[in-house]
Amino acid sequence: MSYENLANLIFPNIDKTPEYYFEKYPKRDLKEGAKVLRYAPSPTGFQHIGGVFASLINERLAHQSGGIFYLRIEDTDQKREVEGAIDDTIKTMHNFGMDFDEGITGENSEKGAYAPYKQSQRADIYRAFVKDLLRKGLAYPCFMTSEELEALREKQIAEKLTPGCYGEFAKYRDLSPEEAIKRIEAGESYVIRMKSPGNPEKRVVAHDMIKGEVSFPENLQDVVIIKGDGLPTYHFAHAIDDTLMRTTHVIRGEEWLSSLPIHLQMFEVLGVEAPKYAHIPTIMKMDGSSKRKLSKRKDPESAVSYYSEKGYPSQSVIEYLLNIINSAFEEWRAENPDADYHDYKVELDKMSKSGALFDLVKLNDVSKDVICKMKPEVVYDLYTNWAKEYDKEMYDLVTSKEAMMKEVFNIDKEGPKPRKDFAKWDEVREKIFYFFDELFDKETANDVELPKTLELEEAKRIIEAYEKAYNFNTDKDTWFSDLKEVAVELGYATDRKKYKKNPEEYKGMVSDVAGAVRAALTHRANTPDLYTIMQIMGEEAVRERFKKFLSL
């Protein structure tokens, strides 16, 4: 009866039992094989790419199995909570194509039958389970002060012992309920610890869905399950929440792998089945010749805001992350160039066991592939949405010429080898600025990129001759024939074999003449198809550009 008295003293207002909550949150009625997974961040900051990576794995595994993907907020450390972090999480995941079937929907809203989905609102649930453990003598109040714990830790380290509260060092583990009651009634502060049933001679062996079989010594620590503020520790909240929310698989960062013995032991003490576990590799990057963890402090690309500011389409980031999750995705994408990425089946056992390498060069390659497949109308919409927030001048210019810009975004896109000009929207300005006099006219002669074989004065002689022969109203073949005629008149070869045989007889190739025209119209040496650019610009604009070039 003493354990009962102790439990009632600590939790006088808790009248629910674990059985009540098991009935309230029954097993989910899902088809066989359907997985229930969650994204469970702490609202202590804004989202980073590692969070998107983890969330994408959970979302894909849930939805490709016909299961449930939910959002739980782990806000038991309320001192570190950042205002707006929850809304940022929801918005970020939505922007990256991940919507939650249930869970938190806003700072103060949620949906789903397994609510509440905020840990800070589940305090009575945790207390009911702790009260039950106290009744059974499986948990106890610990009155050790922070000073005592620090002194114990220093002593253990000095004696080369594992630090912590366990075995002979668990000072209050065997305190009688009567003595504990006296201390509580005297006003002493305490936390509640779970009595570890661990055996120092035994190991716990578990199957990790990424790493395979893992083995650890059994947990011996009497871990804290309720802190001094009455809220649970991460360990205990995880065990209760994932049990009651009927989570089937816990996918989390490998930094939690060392906690697995604690968590498996908690499920055992609670008398419930543990979920399956997978510990995903830490995202790494190359730093010189070595790898290191992607850093929030050192690496701007660790922040989700980086991808918005640079203008990566969300699909590009998703497809790149799928490449990291399963290297086979790249081959699948090559074989299924037009398929929706949702059609690809993520498989944990094919995931790299070591650190996932994050490579911006590879991301850019993936993003170019994604953008080049987009319809011009889609590119226009996505680009203007980005420019409205990050490049107001370009937004005003592009939206003032919507029809023209859709033509621009379609240049060289319909052939067997479509151009891949952009990896992200902040590259668009430099690639299309010459369609706008407002930007083009800011350039000087120093900005003009000529073919290496041409000086500016020779390029001007070419433009003087070509301007007279130029006819806007011709098809592409006729246009090129006219260009070649001008080239021949000026002493340029139109046959590469003849030029290579006797280069001294020519000033250069017809490509140099085309390069001069390109430079006059765009100031750039590398652009999409020149004829198409001229047709989009229109005759008046082309002739005006020739005039400006001759005046440089």
Curated annotation (Swiss-Prot):
Keywords: Aminoacyl-tRNA synthetase, ATP-binding, Cytoplasm, Ligase, Nucleotide-binding, Protein biosynthesis. One of its GO terms (biological process) is glutamyl-tRNA aminoacylation. It catalyses: tRNA(Glu) + L-glutamate + ATP = L-glutamyl-tRNA(Glu) + AMP + diphosphate. The keyword ATP-binding applies. A motif ('HIGH' region) lies at residues 41-51. GO terms for molecular function: ATP binding; glutamate-tRNA ligase activity; tRNA binding; zinc ion binding. ATP binds at residue 296. Its EC number is 6.1.1.17. InterPro entries: aa-tRNA-synth_I_cd-bd, aa-tRNA-synth_I_codon-bd_sub2, aa_tRNA-synth_I_cd-bd_sf, Glu-tRNA-ligase_bac/mito, Glu/Gln-tRNA-synth, Glu/Gln-tRNA-synth_Ib_cat-dom, GluQ/Sye, GluRS_core. Its main location: cytoplasm. GO terms for cellular component: cytosol. A motif ('KMSKS' region) lies at residues 293-297. It is found in: Cytoplasm. It is an enzyme of class 6 (ligase). Pfam families: Anticodon_2, tRNA-synt_1c. The keyword Hydrolase does not apply. Monomer. Belongs to the class-I aminoacyl-tRNA synthetase family. Glutamate--tRNA ligase type 1 subfamily. Catalyzes the attachment of glutamate to tRNA(Glu) in a two-step reaction: glutamate is first activated by ATP to form Glu-AMP and then transferred to the acceptor end of tRNA(Glu). PANTHER family: GLUTAMATE--TRNA LIGASE, GLUTAMATE--TRNA LIGASE, MITOCHONDRIAL-RELATED. This is Glutamate--tRNA ligase.
